[in-house]
C-alpha cells in the first residue's frame, strides 16, 4: 500500500489542486445558469461533454490502479517468464486506435447537431417574428440599432422575453466578439461583414454582456446590460424613446467612432442611414481623421485626443434607461 500511495501521490496532489482551482472559478458560472433556449442548449452540451470526459478519465484511472497493483514488483515474485522484448500486439494496437476514434465520434455528433440547430430561431418560438438588432462594436463600446423601431442605444440593450432576437453583428474597427453568457455563446464581430446570431431570453431580468475578444487598452470596460422585459414594457419603452430621445446626427455618430469609453446613450434614429459597417470597413478610421484624432503608440506621451473637436452631448433624464 505504501508503494501504491507513493506512486499515486503526484496524481492525488494534482487532482486536489484541480478541484481547488475549478471550484474557485465557479463563483459566477453564468454560462451554466442559462436564461434562454439557446444558452440552455449550449449548457446541456457542455455538461454532457464534461460528464462523458470524466467517465473516460475515471476508467483510465481505474485501469491504471489495477495495473499498478497487479503487476507491481514484489518479493517472491517469479520473473522467469518475463520477456522485455515485445515487438507489437495487433489486438492492443487496434483497441487503442479504435477507442479514441469512437470517443471523438461520440462527442462530435451532439456537438455538430447543436451548432447547426443554433443557426436558426429557437424551436419553441420559431413562428414568432424575430426582433432584428444590429450590434456594432466600436473601441470600446457597443452600439445597438433597432431598424424597425428606428431606435439606437449605446452600451445597453432592451429586448422582450419569449421572442427570438436576430443579431446582425459587425465591427467598426477592431475584431471583437459579442457575448451574453446567460443567453448564448459568443460570436465574432468583424469590420466589413455581418454575422447573424439568434438569442432569446425566457425570464425577465438584467443580464451582462461583454466583448469576449481582446481589443486593446479598455477592452475590459467594453460591457453592456441586456434588459429583458415583457412585451408590453418593451413596447412602452419603444414609444417613449421615439417621442422623447434626441435624433442621432452624423456628427454625433462620428464622435462615437473615437476609441474611448462612454456612458449609456439613447437615440430616436439609427446610424444605418449613414453607414453599413457590414459593407464599409473604413468608416471609423475616416471619422477619426475628420475629428482630428491622431493614433499614437500606447507608450507615447502624446495625447491622441489633443486636436479632437467634439460637440458636447448631454443625455436628458428622460432618455436615460
Swiss-Prot record:
In terms of SUPFAM superfamilies, this protein maps to: Cupredoxins, Cytochrome c oxidase subunit II-like, transmembrane region
List where in the cell it is found. Answer: Cell membrane; Membrane raft
Describe its membrane topology: Multi-pass membrane protein
- Lipidated positions per record (N-palmitoyl cysteine): 26
Q: Which residues form the signal peptide?
A: 1-25
Membrane-spanning parts: 49-69, 90-110
Q: Which PROSITE patterns match?
A: COX2_CUA, COX2_TM, PROKAR_LIPOPROTEIN
Q: Give me the Gene Ontology terms describing cellular component.
A: membrane raft; plasma membrane
Q: Which Gene3D superfamilies match?
A: 1.10.287.90, Cupredoxins - blue copper proteins
Task: Give the span(s) annotated as Disordered.
Answer: 294-321
| Record-level Gene Ontology MF annotations | copper ion binding; cytochrome bo3 ubiquinol oxidase activity; cytochrome-c oxidase activity; oxidoreductase activity, acting on diphenols and related substances as donors, oxygen as acceptor
- EC number(s) recorded for this UniProt protein: 1.10.3.-
Q: By its UniProt entry, which InterPro entries does this protein fall under? A: CcO_II, CcO_II-like_C, Cupredoxin, CuRO_UO_II, Cyt_c_oxidase_su2_TM_dom, Cyt_c_oxidase_su2_TM_sf, Cyt_o_ubiquinol_oxidase_su2, QoxA
A GO biological process this protein is involved in?
A: ATP synthesis coupled electron transport
Q: Which chain positions have S-diacylglycerol cysteine-type lipid attachment?
A: 26
The question of whether Electron transport is a record keyword is answered with yes
Question: If you read the UniProt record, what top EC class would you report for this enzyme, in one word?
Answer: oxidoreductase
Any idea what job this protein has? Catalyzes quinol oxidation with the concomitant reduction of oxygen to water. Major component for energy conversion during vegetative growth. Subunit II transfers the electrons from a quinol to the binuclear center of the catalytic subunit I.
UniProt xrefs under NCBIfam families: QOXA
**Assembly:** Interacts with FloT.
Protein name, as recorded:
Quinol oxidase subunit 2
| Name of the coding gene | qoxA
